Swiss-Prot record:
InterPro entries cross-referenced by the UniProt entry: TMEM225
Claim: rRNA-binding is one of the keywords in the record: no
Entry keyword Phosphoprotein: no
Source superkingdom: Eukaryota
Compartments where located: Cytoplasmic vesicle, Secretory vesicle, Acrosome membrane
Main location: membrane
Stated name of the protein: Transmembrane protein 225
Source organism of this protein record: Homo sapiens
Bilayer topology: Multi-pass membrane protein
Keywords of the record: Cytoplasmic vesicle, Membrane, Transmembrane, Transmembrane helix
Side of membrane Cytoplasmic, spans: 1-8, 94-99, 158-225
Length: 225
């Protein structure tokens, strides 16, 4: 069975969350998520869900909900990476509540991003029947789905870290109770020892008293003679 420490889990968690943030920022700067193709296949236009103004092939700006969800996912990813970094450098306590919070944050950020991508695909299919003939997905779109995977892995790692810390706490409590039992047994033995050692002392003292009495009696006899 492979043993994984908490520090290695925290390091992998920071690595995956950092990659998720980097790819999200890269997706904001690059606007070639999808290539829209017109009906005569002459006009081609790049499109991204981060665009505030829509191109001529897609005049209606109905991606406000998608942008809000992707913005919330980006903000939560930044917050997750910050908390994981502070926890790795011991700036915040490493308890199960922080680990549960990072787990919820990871899964919620991944679900928000996945839901935004599904909505964006739905809008592309709706626009295909009205504004353009077809579209082609580029590699940036696949990196967005890779971000969903990274955030899900962060949630699983946070759950694993919480489980390991909980099991280690129970083992420490059991070890502490065993030590307390051993200390109590030792104290009982220490208390019972003086009672056993007191008996020979009393015998020795009685013997000395009897010997003194015999000496006194012999002295009295000699003086009488």
């Amino acid at each position: 069975m492979v043993h994984v420490s908490n520090r290695s889990i925290q390091g992998m968690n920071i690595l995956f969350s950092s990659w998720a943030v980097v790819l999200m920022v890269m997706g904001i700067t690059l606007d070639k998520w999808v290539e829209l193709i017109s009906e005569d296949e002459r006009a081609k236009m790049n499109h991204s869900p981060w665009m505030m103004c829509c191109p001529a092939l897609w005049p209606e700006d109905d991606l406000k909900v998608v942008r809000i969800m992707m913005t919330s996912s980006l903000g939560l990813s930044f917050l997750l990476n910050l908390i994981l970094g502070m926890k790795f450098t011991y700036l915040i306590p490493q308890n199960k509540y922080i680990q549960l919070f990072t787990t919820i944050l990871s899964f919620f950020s991944g679900i928000s991003l996945l839901w935004a991508l599904i909505l964006y695909h739905n809008k592309l299919k709706q626009g295909q029947s009205m504004h353009f003939s077809s579209y082609r997905i580029t590699w940036i779109m696949y990196t967005a789905y890779l971000n969903v995977f990274f955030l899900s892995v962060c949630g699983v790692l946070s759950l694993l870290e919480c489980k390991l810390s909980t099991s280690s706490c129970t083992c420490l409590n059991i070890h502490k109770s065993d030590n307390e039992c051993k200390e109590s047994e030792n104290s009982i033995e220490d208390i019972s020892l003086p009672e056993c050692t007191a008996m020979p002392r009393s015998i020795v003292r009685a013997h000395t008293v009897n010997s003194l009495n015999k000496k006194v009696q012999t002295r009295h006899v000699t003086w009488a003679l």
